[in-house]
Curated annotation (Swiss-Prot):
GO terms for cellular component: ribonucleoprotein complex; ribosome. The lineage of its organism: Bacteria, Pseudomonadati, Pseudomonadota, Gammaproteobacteria, Oceanospirillales. Part of the 50S ribosomal subunit. PROSITE patterns: RIBOSOMAL_L16_2. Keywords: Ribonucleoprotein, Ribosomal protein, RNA-binding, rRNA-binding, tRNA-binding. It comes from Carsonella ruddii (strain PV). This is Large ribosomal subunit protein uL16. GO terms for biological process: translation. Binds 23S rRNA and is also seen to make contacts with the A and possibly P site tRNAs.
Amino acid sequence: MKNKPDQLKYSKYQKNRNKGFSTKRNYLIHGNYGLKSIENGFLNFKQIESARKMLIHFLGKSSKILIRVFPDKVLTKKPLEVRMGKGKGPIYDWVSVIKPGIILFEVLNFNYLIVKKAFYVASQKLSIKTEICYE
């Protein structure tokens, strides 16, 4: 998985407010179990990748895992003890904007107990609250 997009129209964007519920990406497509977010927040590449590794560790390579989020938004940050002004700061991190209801991961597996344990361990790696959804 790539940790940032290849090209963007602009290198830096405004942060914007993250409020409301998701009206897209809130249903299962390929899998029969999913990990759904229930609060707002940001997920960076390291969090997504560590959760993916935990899913692979518990589920094995036989079950199909689909990642539905990608870090496509840039966050900037000015260095410590720098006065205000003189432009926007350098790129600090790439994040994915998460709203309540977005499906983060999908799994195609038929044993609910194994999937439940794998999703629990994967959700511990994320900075937002999640729940398991199924068909």
